[in-house]
C-alpha cells in the first residue's frame, strides 16, 4: 500500500496490509518523503511488524538523473539505512530509456542489505529490453519490480496482456508487483487474472 502520511500508515496497519511504501506527493507518482516522517513511520511499522519501503526519487518527470541528482539519491539511501528503513524503491534510466547500470550499481551498493524494489521506471524501458533488464536486476539482488504494464495514462485493464507476458517472462526469484489503477474494488479480479499474490496501490484496501 502506497501512502504519504502517518494517517495513511496507521490506516494500512489497521487494514492488515503486508507492506507499506512511504512517499511524498503521490499525485506526482511519488517522491522522496522527509526524514522526520520516515523516522516516525519506522516506529509505527516496526511496532506493527510491517515492512516499510521508502521511495527514493528526487523529482517528478523522467528517470534520467543528473550526477548531482544521483549524489542526492545516494545520500538519501544512506540516511534511510541509518534510520532503520527496511527497504527502498528507485529506478534510473539512460536518456534512451534503458537501465542505467552504472548508476544502479552505485545506488544498490549504498542500499547494502536493504531490500530494493525497482519502481515504475520499468514501464519506460522498451518492451524488447525488459526481459534482459529483469535478469540484470535479479543478478544484482533486486527481487521485486513494480509495473503498470504501460503508461499510467492507460487503464490497467488495457495493459493486462503485457502484464501477463511480463510475469510469464520473469526469471525465477523475481516478483512482479502490478500497480497503478489497482484498488480494493478490482484487486481480487486482477490478482486472479494475473495469478499473483501481491499487488500495489494507494487504495488497495478499503479504509473505514
Predicted feature locations:
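Catalytic cores of alpha/beta
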Residues: 4-15, 61-79, 116, 123-140, ...
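Small-side-chain structural scaffolding
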Residues: 9-17, 41, 85-91, 110-111, ...
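A short, flexible beta-alpha/helix-coil linker loop
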Residues: 26-27, 58-62
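Hydrophobic faces of well-ordered beta-strands that scaffold small-molecule active sites
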Residues: 1-3, 20-22, 50-56, 88-90, ...
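Active-site-adjacent beta->alpha loops and helix N-cap segments on the catalytic face
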Residues: 6-10, 26-51, 67-71, 93-112, ...
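Glycine-rich phosphate-binding active-site loops on the catalytic face of alpha/beta enzymes
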Residues: 17-31, 79-96, 140-155, 182, ...
